Amino acid sequence: MKISVGNDIVENARIRDLLEKHGDRFLKRIFSESEREYCSNRKDPVPHLSGRFCVKEAFIKAIEPKVVLDMREIELFGKEFGKKELVLHGKSKELFLTKGYNGCSVSISHAENYSTAVVVLYKE
């Protein structure tokens, strides 16, 4: 079995600043419609946006750090306290399949000031 690991951490204030400065333009550039909807229904959407941002960055680091991918093609789904699942589209999915990966695990955490994520890609 071969695995590839990516991780990321972001200061929640950084995402809050981007959201205040660029608003919908920032959201629509990074997050899918379903991700935006999920986060907007939270008391404070910023930690949830930050965590999803980290997942996208961690996926890119795990699959190919030098490649440019549309972050909206990397979607995080799952219950609030349940198992998370990545759903890939377009070039992200194509790259995942081309490299022969057949599985992915995601871990995401939030704290008051930071959000972090780890993505593990694997092929058997």
Swiss-Prot record:
Superkingdom of the organism of origin = Bacteria
Q: Per its record, what are the GO molecular function terms?
A: holo-[acyl-carrier-protein] synthase activity; magnesium ion binding
Q: Where in the cell is it found?
A: Cytoplasm
Which InterPro entries does the record match to this protein? 4-PPantetheinyl_Trfase_dom, 4-PPantetheinyl_Trfase_dom_sf, ACPS, Ppantetheine-prot_Trfase_dom
Recorded family membership:
Belongs to the P-Pant transferase superfamily. AcpS family.
The residues listed in the UniProt record as binding Mg(2+), with positions renumbered to this chain, are D8, E57
| Catalytic activity, EC | 2.7.8.7
Name the UniProt key words of this record, in alphabetical order.
Cytoplasm, Fatty acid biosynthesis, Fatty acid metabolism, Lipid biosynthesis, Lipid metabolism, Magnesium, Metal-binding, Transferase
Query: A GO BP term, please?
Result: fatty acid biosynthetic process
Q: What is this protein called?
A: Holo-[acyl-carrier-protein] synthase
Which SUPFAM superfamilies is this protein grouped with?
4'-phosphopantetheinyl transferase (SSF56214)
Outline what the protein does.
Answer: Transfers the 4'-phosphopantetheine moiety from coenzyme A to a Ser of acyl-carrier-protein.
One family name in Pfam for this protein: ACPS
Which cysteines share a disulfide bond? none
The scientific name of the source species is: Leptospira borgpetersenii serovar Hardjo-bovis (strain JB197)
Main localization (coarse): cytoplasm
Essential cofactor(s): Mg(2+)
List the GO terms this entry assigns under cellular component, sorted alphabetically.
cytoplasm
Query: Catalyzes what?
Result: apo-[ACP] + CoA = holo-[ACP] + adenosine 3',5'-bisphosphate + H(+)
| Top EC group | transferase
